[in-house]
């Protein structure tokens, strides 16, 4: 079964899955208090329990190796902001082209990636991190020191066939370009979700 087929799941968690996910998120929250200041688990949990479709998306982030964690709270909207916080680009989302156009270009050449970042993110109900969000993420830890992650590409770059990705090397954040049809075993994507 390819990765895209795996994503065509019912977008609802069983009570057992919901409890397991909440336990995982609570443990991660407690173990990474340095990522956020002034947030309380009880308020976050109440918000999560009221948004079952968002729990499903968080579960998809978790299931594919993203280790989602809350990184901020938008005081204007009241939303909590989650990013994939796995040390390396999520394992269940690697070997993907940037978007469907890139994937189709590869497949015409007889090469079959695991899918594409844009469609996978949409199916999961998340957004790719922007370059700015990626840089914010890197302020709370060292991520992608051995891998890289596609980031949301500006339309003017994408129109010309390119896409951008980022990583951390030599204690610096690098943003690079590549053709959208490219895919690698060490490149995936990181998502963001507002709850």
Predicted regions and their residues:
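A binding-site-centric feature that preferentially detects glycan-recognition modules on secreted/surface proteins
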Residues: 2-127, 131-195
């Amino acid at each position: 079964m390819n990765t895209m087929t795996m994503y065509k799941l019912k977008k609802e968690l069983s009570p057992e899955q919901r409890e397991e996910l909440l336990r995982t998120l609570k443990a991660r929250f407690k173990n990474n208090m340095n990522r956020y200041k002034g947030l309380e688990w009880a308020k976050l949990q109440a918000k999560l329990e009221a948004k079952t479709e968002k729990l499903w998306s968080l579960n998809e982030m978790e299931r594919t190796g993203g280790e989602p964690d809350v990184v901020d709270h938008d005081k204007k909207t009241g939303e909590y902001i989650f990013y994939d916080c796995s040390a390396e680009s999520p394992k269940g989302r690697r070997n993907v082209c940037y978007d469907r156009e890139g994937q189709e270009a590869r497949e015409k050449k007889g090469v079959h990636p695991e899918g594409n970042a844009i469609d996978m993110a949409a199916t999961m109900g998340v957004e790719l991190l922007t370059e700015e969000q990626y840089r914010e993420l890197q302020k709370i830890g060292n991520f992608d020191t051995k891998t890289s992650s596609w980031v949301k590409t500006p339309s003017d770059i994408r129109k010309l066939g390119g896409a951008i990705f980022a990583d951390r090397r030599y204690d610096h954040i690098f943003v690079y370009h590549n053709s959208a049809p490219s895919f690698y075993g060490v490149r995936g994507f990181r998502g963001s979700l507002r709850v």
